[in-house]
Amino acid sequence: MGRLALLLACWTTLAAARPDPARTAVLVNTDQPAGLAIARAFMTHRGIPAANLIALPLGRTETLEWQDYATRVLGPLRTRLLAAGLLEGKQEESADPRGRSGFIPTGDARLRWLVLVHGVPLKVAPSGIKGLNPANPVKGDHASLDSELALLALPNLEPEGARPNPWFGRADAGGDGVIRTARLDGASPEAVLAALRGAWAAEAQGLRGRAYVDLGGPYQEGDDWFRACLAPLRELGFPPDVEETKDQFPPTARGDAPAFYLGWYSQKPTGKFGQKPTRLAPGAIALHLHSFSAASLHNPATNWAPWLVEQGAGLTFGNVYEPYLSLTVRPELLLKGLREGMSAGEAAWFATPSVSWQGIILGDPFYQPFAVTLEAQVRAASAKEALGDYALLRHFNLLPQPLGTEALRRLQAAADRSGRLALRLACAQAEQAAGVTRPWKDPLDLSAEEGGLIAEAVRFVEARFGVKTAQKLRAELEKRPEGATPARPGTEKAPAK
C-alpha cells in the first residue's frame, strides 16, 4: 500500500475528537467591546450556547498584578461558571496573600475549554512573594493569564514555577481538573477575524500549501525538535523547504502558500516570514519559537505571535515571559497530534509541557486542518483557484517517486490547465527526476508569482534549459503584478487520479 493510501486509511479510521461546544465557555472584556464581535462569530460558527458567553469588566491593560487577577478575573469568572453549572465547588470569603478567594471543588467541572477573546488581559506580573520551594530552578509566579486560568477548577495552588501539563503527550488524559484554554487575539480585531475565517475555510476545503522549517537556533535540543518535523511533513505530502543557517529564511527565499511555518530564533519578525507580502495560507499552522514572542499582542512589528496572526495563521503560539526551552511547545508533538486527528487546540495542549506558566495558544481550538481528505481536495481542485494547485502537488508528492509515465502525464495536464508557476515548476522538476527531457514552455501563459518562487524557477530553468530561456522567464514574470493571470482556455476541474 502506498503512502497516500495509508494516509487516507489512517484518517478515515480516526474519529474526529472535537471539543464539546456545550462544555466551552468564552470570556470577553466589556471594557474593550471590539472582542464581542469575534466572540459572537466564533460561538455562532461552533454552536456554542449563548449562555456560555461570560462578559466581565477587565480593564484596558495587557498585564495585571496578582491582586487584580484574583479579584477582577479569577473570582468573578468562577462565580459565573458556578452559576452556569459549568463548575462545581464553593468559594470562600478568606483570601490568600495574592488576593485569591479560597475555592473547594465539590465535583468534576462540566467545563472543558475556556476561550479568551481579544481584549482580555494577557499576563500576570510577578508578585514578589517568596515561593514555597526555593530549590525550584524554574522560579517566579508570573504567567500568562491563559495558563493560570487553566487551574481555575482546582483549589488555589502555589503558583511558584511551572506545573506539569497532564495533557502533555497524552491523547487520552483526563486532565486532572486542568481546563484547556485558547485565545482568539492579535493586534486588531480585523486580523483576528481574518485569521479565524481562514481557518474555517481550510477546515471546509482542506489545508493547502507548502511547508517551511527554519533550523539553526541557539540550542541543539530545539533544533532536534524542529528537525524531527521534517519526516512527518514529507509523509503528509508537504516536503519542506529547510533553512539550516543561524539566520532566518532570507527575503529572497521561496515563500508561496505557507501551510506550515515552523522555526526559530529571532526576537522580532525578520527574514522572509517577517515580510508583509509573505502571507500565510488560510488555516496555516505557524510557530516561531522565541522566549518573548507574545510579550505583547499589540505590536506585530516586534512580537512574532501577533505578527503570525496578522499574516493569517490559523494556529500559532507565544510566550509572555521567559519560559525556558524545555517548557515550551514541542513542534514535533504538535504535528503528531494533528496527524492523529486531534483538533488544533487538542494538538496544542498535547504538545505543551507545562501549565501555570508562560505559553499561550492563539487560534480556534475546534479547528480541524485535516477534516477534508486529500482525495476530496484533489477532486475539487480547479484551475480557477491557485490553492487547488497545492492539493494536486501534495497528491503527486505522495505517489512513488520518481513519477511514472501516467502520473507525469496527469501532472503535465494539470500544469497546463493551471498556468501557474508552482505547478509548472513541479512538473518540470518531476520530469527531470524521471529522466524526461522536454522544452520549457513559453512563459507568456504563466501567471505572475511571489519573488522567491520566480527565483527558484529561474535557477532551475537556467541549469536545465540555459541562460537565455531563464532570462526570458524572469523578464516576463517580473514585469507583471503578482497574481496576474493571462486568459486561457480550459478551466475545467482536474481529474481525481
Show which residues each predicted segment covers.
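Terminal, low-structured helical/coil segments at or just beyond the last alpha-helical repeat
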Residues: K468-K497
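Short coil/turn linking the two alpha-helices of tandem helical-hairpin repeats
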Residues: Q401-L403, A433-T437, F465-G466, E482
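Alpha-helical repeat scaffolds
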Residues: E406-A415, T437-A448, T469-K479
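Bacterial N-terminal signal peptides
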Residues: R3-T13
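Cysteine-dependent hydrolase recognition
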Residues: R18-R410, D416-R420, A433
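Generic helix N-cap/helix-start motif at coil->alpha-helix transitions
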Residues: E385-L392, R417-L425, E449-E456, T469, ...
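Conserved small-residue packing positions in alpha-helical repeats and bundles
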Residues: L393-N397, A426-Q432, V458-A463
